[in-house]
Amino acid sequence: MADSTDEVTAVPRMMVDIETLGLEPGSAILSIGAVQFTEDGLEEEFYAEVSLESCQEAGLEIDADTLEWWLGQDDEVTGILTGGDDLTHVLDEFRLWFPDDAEVWANSPSFDCEHLGVAFDAVGMSEPWAFYDERDVRTLKSLPGAANVEMEGNEHDALDDAKHQARFVVETLQNLDSAARTGVDA
């Protein structure tokens, strides 16, 4: 019989991060970054940039203040504003990549998962996770034993952010597990 730790680690864990042109659900999505992770580290990655035109055609909106903020960023970051693939194609590819019955982690699900849910609805698809599989990185940040993980890559790059958040979760869960095994406060 498997112990509860084996059962928990058997569930695929996916970290998701998006970049958008607005803070409200229904905003245009610029990019989706995601990475599968286990207690041992990062695994498969997903990254796609989304065409703003296809977002608008699907009914997603562009917030002028957020667009202005993006235009004030480094050239390396603002390149995301042009090009990209069709929203429907990107979301379909994401659904195909996303494993069944996986936990979806985000910082925070009320932003990333909700925005993605609205985008999936806009193109007539359902998101590839159930609401009860959403996990919040912010909860772990508030716990004793939360890891201090240095950012690698670029902030506001959806894949770099997803990988950073996943590394944080992996290290924090390792810290908490170690503390539980030794009976010491993390």
Predicted regions and their residues:
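Hydrophobic positions within alpha-helical membrane elements
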Residues: 22-24, 141, 166
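Residue-level signal for well-ordered alpha-helical scaffold segments within enzymatic catalytic domains
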Residues: 80, 93-96, 114, 118, ...
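Short, flexible loop segments at boundaries between secondary-structure elements
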Residues: 128-148
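Anionic group-transfer/hydrolysis microenvironments
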Residues: 19-21, 35, 108-109, 114, ...
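Conserved non-catalytic scaffold segment of RNase H-like nuclease domains
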Residues: 2-14, 19-106, 152
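Acidic, Mg2+-coordinating catalytic module of metal-dependent nucleases/exonucleases
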Residues: 103-109, 114-115, 146-186
